[in-house]
Amino acid sequence: MNILSAIIVFENLHEVKRLFHWGPIIALTVIGVCSSMAILDSIIWYWPLDTTGGSINFIMLINWTVLILYNYFNAMFVGPGYIPLEWKPEKQQDIMYLQFCRLCQGYKAPRSHHCRKCNRCVMKMDHHCPWINNCCGHLNHAYFTSFLLLAPLGCIHAALIFIMTMYTQLYDRISFGWSSVKIDMSAARHIHHPIMPFSIAAFAATLFALGLALGTTIAVGMLFFIQMKVILRNRTSIEAWIEEKAKDRIQYYQTGEDFIFPYDLGSRWENFKQVFTWSGAPMGDGIEWPVHEKCDQYTLTIEQLKQKHDKRQRSVEYRVVEEYNGACCPLGKGLNTFFRTPCTEEPRIKLTKGETIFATRGTKWWMYGDKVLNEEQAKAGVRIRGWFPRRCVEKCLYDSANNSTSEEKKEQ
């Protein structure tokens, strides 16, 4: 009922537009091709419905399709859960432990992060997935992971059907010569008489579906193991990055701090139960979380504030000396810039001569930073940050002592 309520409720009708994106279109096409070809191959050529095994096989194929689509659409339409706009903690004094989101005009609750694609602060955000055209987060993590498990299992079943269909239909039709292999599609089969002949077109379609099924099994199966690692450690991909930076910060400044990740409850089973429950809904409200006994609700958010302050201290001021149109791979900026573009979904930003940028990290050919905006844009909560070619900027000579440490010294 979750998916039906998400679609039927008037306020959420706009969610249907998530289907009109290359990710869901490709995903649903692959599901449709593999499912339909497996069913057709079974009924027509391999395992007819007038046998017990054929009937059981047909029911299993239908069940795989239903379960895969159920979890896929729930992951898409139920969504990750969003922090309410202009949200504030119940206790006013807790504001000092939280980051403020200028776009949502509210504070970021623990474990939440702002998604550029969804344009909202997402509860326990792991990542924005293009295949569901939505974020993977608190409310849909179980659905998303179940989909990642069921899709490879269904594809393995379908792949076996494809292989056995081609084997049984081609076994008596293949002849091997010294230098060639011949397939006589007009030769009769001796096992059972199919509803229609297994033609070259049917062979090509089955072979194509087999490739899709095997590719999906490998690709989606790898994603499943990544998500299970996230769940069993109760640590999202973003939080793993924050923890890594925390250790680097402590080591770099020799602060002697002992950072403990707050959301790992010490038991894989306890971590697992935070996402998968008998009711189907995850534990918690997406705002407050069970934490390690030596931590509190704001242990991670305080660390994030420290890292944010550290990033500001290490930022370096640059002035734009060359125009840049924001292209992903700008050939006009040199071959090294073209071929060594950052492999990330983070945006590129347009540059105009005379603009000022505070760079926080970079590579040999690219830099990442925040553009200095005018007062009106700043009040409106506008923030422009992203990657740009290093050759388009030059370091300001009057850079302050606090900002003089270049990013080349320590890249993130």
From Swiss-Prot:
Which residues point to the Lumenal side?
Answer: 46-57, 165-205
For the lipid attachment S-palmitoyl cysteine, which residues are annotated? C328, C329, C343
* InterPro entries reported in the protein's UniProt record: Palmitoyltrfase_DHHC, PFA4/ZDH16/20/ERF2-like
Residue intervals of the DHHC domain: 99-149
Q: Which keywords has UniProt assigned to this entry?
A: Acyltransferase, Endoplasmic reticulum, Lipoprotein, Membrane, Palmitate, SH3 domain, Transferase, Transmembrane, Transmembrane helix
What domain of life does the native source organism fall in?
A: Eukaryota
Q: Where are the transmembrane segments?
A: 25-45, 58-78, 144-164, 206-226
A single GO BP:
protein targeting to membrane
- Any GO MF annotation of the entry: protein-cysteine S-stearoyltransferase activity
Task: Specify the SH3 domain's residue ranges.
Answer: 313-398
Q: Which residues form a coiled coil?
A: none
Location within or outside the cell: Endoplasmic reticulum membrane
- EC code: 2.3.1.225, 2.3.1.-
Q: What is the documented function of this protein?
A: Endoplasmic reticulum palmitoyl acyltransferase that probably catalyzes the addition of palmitate onto various protein substrates and is involved in a variety of cellular processes. Could also function as a stearoyltransferase.
Read off the domain note.
Answer: The DHHC domain is required for palmitoyltransferase activity.
Q: What is this protein called?
A: Palmitoyltransferase ZDHHC6
Source organism of this protein record:
Danio rerio (Zebrafish)
Gene, per the UniProt record: zdhhc6
